[in-house]
From Swiss-Prot:
<feature type="binding site">
    <location>
        <position position="120"/>
    </location>
    <ligand>
        <name>[4Fe-4S] cluster 2</name>
    </ligand>
</feature>
<dbReference type="InterPro" id="IPR017900">
    <property type="entry name" value="4Fe4S_Fe_S_CS"/>
</dbReference>
<comment type="subunit">
    <text>The complex is composed of six subunits: RnfA, RnfB, RnfC, RnfD, RnfE and RnfG.</text>
</comment>
<feature type="binding site">
    <location>
        <position position="124"/>
    </location>
    <ligand>
        <name>[4Fe-4S] cluster 3</name>
    </ligand>
</feature>
<dbReference type="GO" id="GO:0046872">
    <property type="term" value="F:metal ion binding"/>
</dbReference>
<protein>
    <recommendedName>
        <fullName>Ion-translocating oxidoreductase complex subunit B</fullName>
        <ecNumber>7.-.-.-</ecNumber>
    </recommendedName>
</protein>
<comment type="function">
    <text>Part of a membrane-bound complex that couples electron transfer with translocation of ions across the membrane.</text>
</comment>
<dbReference type="GO" id="GO:0051539">
    <property type="term" value="F:4 iron, 4 sulfur cluster binding"/>
</dbReference>
<dbReference type="InterPro" id="IPR050294">
    <property type="entry name" value="RnfB_subfamily"/>
</dbReference>
<keyword id="KW-0472">Membrane</keyword>
<keyword id="KW-1003">Cell membrane</keyword>
<feature type="domain" description="4Fe-4S">
    <location>
        <begin position="32"/>
        <end position="90"/>
    </location>
</feature>
<feature type="binding site">
    <location>
        <position position="49"/>
    </location>
    <ligand>
        <name>[4Fe-4S] cluster 1</name>
    </ligand>
</feature>
<dbReference type="InterPro" id="IPR016463">
    <property type="entry name" value="RnfB/RsxB_Proteobac"/>
</dbReference>
<keyword id="KW-0004">4Fe-4S</keyword>
<feature type="binding site">
    <location>
        <position position="73"/>
    </location>
    <ligand>
        <name>[4Fe-4S] cluster 1</name>
    </ligand>
</feature>
<dbReference type="Pfam" id="PF14697">
    <property type="entry name" value="Fer4_21"/>
</dbReference>
């Protein structure tokens, strides 16, 4: 047998042995995740902005499962608080952040002042800033969550948080406040009223 064939067989046997060991270890030492943490994490907006005081949505979900307040997520707003309250079986709380008076904002980079240091790119938790080293950076407006984590690291202060223009696309439609009436029920109610008058 040639040495190349022996080497290939030896590598295949070693790969099979190590694969079996890894397969056994993954079954034997499997760590079960808490299903409530997964459910909470699915409700959170996944912006990873850190405004709640945790480094991301998953650590905040774990903290909520361990009894932390459900009202610390500004990007999620009151709707997320209500969903979390429903899931956890508690009363919805007011947001820990003043959501009503806070105007939604997005980052804006004054490109004539940008030196391309990439510090804002590294700070952005949602990858809403694009640009290369020593090149002008810009913000993808639709991706920006307005967390303002990119403002502090900028050495030239070229990043500004500007209010989001309200358009029909960005307006928060309060469709739940509009009463929905089933037409067939309304028609039968009207017929019953007409019959009772006769």
């Amino acid at each position: 047998m040639s040495t190349i064939l022996i080497a290939i067989i030896a590598l295949a046997v070693l790969a099979a042995i190590f694969g079996a060991i890894l397969g056994f270890a993954s079954i034997r030492f499997k760590v079960e995740a808490d299903p409530i943490v997964d459910q909470i994490d699915a409700i959170l907006p996944q912006t990873q902005c850190g405004q709640c005081g945790y480094p991301g949505c998953r650590p905040y979900a774990e903290a909520i499962a361990n009894g932390d307040n459900i009202n610390k997520c500004p990007p999620g707003g009151q709707a997320t608080i209500e969903k979390l309250a429903d899931l956890m079986g508690v009363e919805p709380e007011e947001s820990a952040h003043d959501l009503d008076s806070k105007v939604p904002t997005v980052a804006f980079i004054h490109e004539d002042m940008c030196i391309g240091c990439t510090k804002c790119i590294q700070a952005c938790p949602v990858d809403a800033i694009v640009g290369g080293t020593k090149a002008v950076h810009t913000v993808i407006k639709d991706e920006c969550t307005g967390c303002d984590l990119c403002v502090a690291p900028c050495p030239t202060d070229c990043i500004e948080m500007i209010p989001v223009e309200t358009t029909t696309d960005s307006w928060k439609w309060q469709l739940n406040a509009i009463p929905v009436v089933n037409i067939t029920d309304a028609a039968s109610d009207a017929a019953n009223v007409k019959d009772s008058i006769k």
